[in-house]
């Protein structure tokens, strides 16, 4: 008799996605981050759901409701800190996942890659709106500064900003709509994840060598289910260590002060995972130029498949490209550091150099390195 998982209409989908899926035999731990992102999304949805049961999206009570969750709700502090630090884990996994895609040439699966970029934008938007909800000083001023950037758009900018605010400043209407969007977006993200996986399963997974692995496949279960389970354990361990020992390590102390429109914090900065983009934004003196650079810092990922001129897919056997890739990683760390520093000498100059280097590596140096490596292949 045929196994039920192979004939049942619903179980058949699960079977083809998680059990009998043919997977390359040589994929490394860098391929764990997809499933870890799925775990992060589930953690965020469940903790967020329980937080939403006690949160009020009103400017007068939002801050107090978060305090109430931490003090009075049973294990509320735990749920709140898992949610806050879960976002950090989410972004660590996201950046690792994207980095893996760039290093091993996974961007040649263009549909999967483009849905991935869309997912990245959606997660960033969700995280930004979530940061506004506690209604602390950094929540309020972060919302004011970032939404204000849209005023740089010619002709419609000012109207657009007021339309998003729902008034003439960040106020109750803004908070309410941000809460509504923050609640609905993770479910849209979950739907996009399904599309992401649908496109991925059309082609099958890439592997570290970048060579087609059709002749060497193994079933997903038990090999990669146990491997993913180990990843889940390690991620959960790190998340719980962060939550239980130093839950405020990655947060901003200013956000423990209730929002006050009359008092600007000395250094307005976003959460650590946006600092690299914030540094690129600040390194351009022109407002519209800064906004374009900010958007392009992420959107540049969409150009990578078209800039791929190497005869090899993966960087595994391309030492010049490898050196450039790790320079890019170091550059992103530099930008993250600069984004958290005040706007003064020498940080301004370092930020500008790092921003130019970021775009130069992706748009100019990597294609050049590929050309050189192609020439070396002929020798």
From Swiss-Prot:
The chain crosses the membrane at residues 33-53, 77-98, 113-133, 178-198, 226-246, 288-308, 320-340, 347-367. The keyword Electron transport applies. GO terms for cellular component: mitochondrial inner membrane; respiratory chain complex III. Binds 2 heme b groups non-covalently. It is a multi-pass membrane protein. The keyword Transmembrane helix applies. GO terms for molecular function: metal ion binding; ubiquinol-cytochrome-c reductase activity. Heme b b562 binds at residues 83, 182. Its cofactor is heme b. GO terms for biological process: mitochondrial electron transport, ubiquinol to cytochrome c. PROSITE patterns: CYTB_CTER (PS51003), CYTB_NTER (PS51002). A ubiquinone binds at residue 201. Its main location: mitochondrion. Heme b b566 binds at residues 97, 196. It is found in: Mitochondrion inner membrane. Keywords: Electron transport, Heme, Iron, Membrane, Metal-binding, Mitochondrion, Mitochondrion inner membrane, Respiratory chain, Transmembrane, Transmembrane helix, Transport, Ubiquinone. The cytochrome bc1 complex contains 11 subunits: 3 respiratory subunits (MT-CYB, CYC1 and UQCRFS1), 2 core proteins (UQCRC1 and UQCRC2) and 6 low-molecular weight proteins (UQCRH/QCR6, UQCRB/QCR7, UQCRQ/QCR8, UQCR10/QCR9, UQCR11/QCR10 and a cleavage product of UQCRFS1). This cytochrome bc1 complex then forms a dimer. Belongs to the cytochrome b family. Component of the ubiquinol-cytochrome c reductase complex (complex III or cytochrome b-c1 complex) that is part of the mitochondrial respiratory chain. The b-c1 complex mediates electron transfer from ubiquinol to cytochrome c. Contributes to the generation of a proton gradient across the mitochondrial membrane that is then used for ATP synthesis. Heme 1 (or BL or b562) is low-potential and absorbs at about 562 nm, and heme 2 (or BH or b566) is high-potential and absorbs at about 566 nm. This is Cytochrome b. It comes from Romerolagus diazi (Volcano rabbit). The lineage of its organism: Eukaryota, Metazoa, Chordata, Craniata, Vertebrata.
